[in-house]
Amino acid sequence: MAAPTMKERQACWGARDEYWKCLDENTEDASKCKKLRSSFESSCPQQWIKYFDKRRDYLKFKEKFEAGDFQPSKMTAKS
């Protein structure tokens, strides 16, 4: 598989950004962003989609942690 061209990368990043914006505006309700998710999936290589999904999860976790909203699980609290 050839590496994506600059135009393909920009289309992927744009689709990702639109999807993430939709999630932010709809309090993470993915059902309201299905069309944008489809566009994201059709614009990006599968490996990139996995990476971006994990990256978003990490960034949201980090945001909560830094804001002091993180609550450790009961298993973690016992350790």
UniProtKB/Swiss-Prot annotation:
PANTHER family in the cross-refs: CYTOCHROME C OXIDASE ASSEMBLY FACTOR 6 HOMOLOG
Family recorded in the similarity comment: Belongs to the cytochrome c oxidase subunit 6B family.
Superkingdom, taxonomy of origin: Eukaryota
Function recorded in the entry: Involved in the maturation of the mitochondrial respiratory chain complex IV subunit MT-CO2/COX2. Thereby, may regulate early steps of complex IV assembly. Mitochondrial respiratory chain complex IV or cytochrome c oxidase is the component of the respiratory chain that catalyzes the transfer of electrons from intermembrane space cytochrome c to molecular oxygen in the matrix and as a consequence contributes to the proton gradient involved in mitochondrial ATP synthesis. May also be required for efficient formation of respiratory supercomplexes comprised of complexes III and IV.
Localization in the cell: Mitochondrion intermembrane space
Pfam families attached to this UniProt entry: COX6B
Annotated motif Cx10C motif, positions: 33-44
Main location: mitochondrion
GO function term, MF aspect, one: copper ion binding
Record-level GO cellular component terms: mitochondrial intermembrane space; mitochondrion
Chain ranges of the CHCH domain: 9-52
Biological processes per GO annotation: mitochondrial ATP synthesis coupled electron transport; mitochondrial cytochrome c oxidase assembly; respiratory chain complex IV assembly
Subunit structure as annotated in this protein's UniProt entry: Found in a complex with TMEM177, COX20, MT-CO2/COX2, COX18, SCO1 and SCO2. Interacts with COA1, MT-CO2/COX2, SCO1, SCO2 and COX20. Interacts with COX20 in a MT-CO2/COX2- and COX18-dependent manner. Interacts with COX16.
Name under which the protein is recorded: Cytochrome c oxidase assembly factor 6 homolog
Keyword Phosphoprotein belongs to the record: no
Organism of this sequence: Bos taurus
Keywords of this entry: Disulfide bond, Mitochondrion
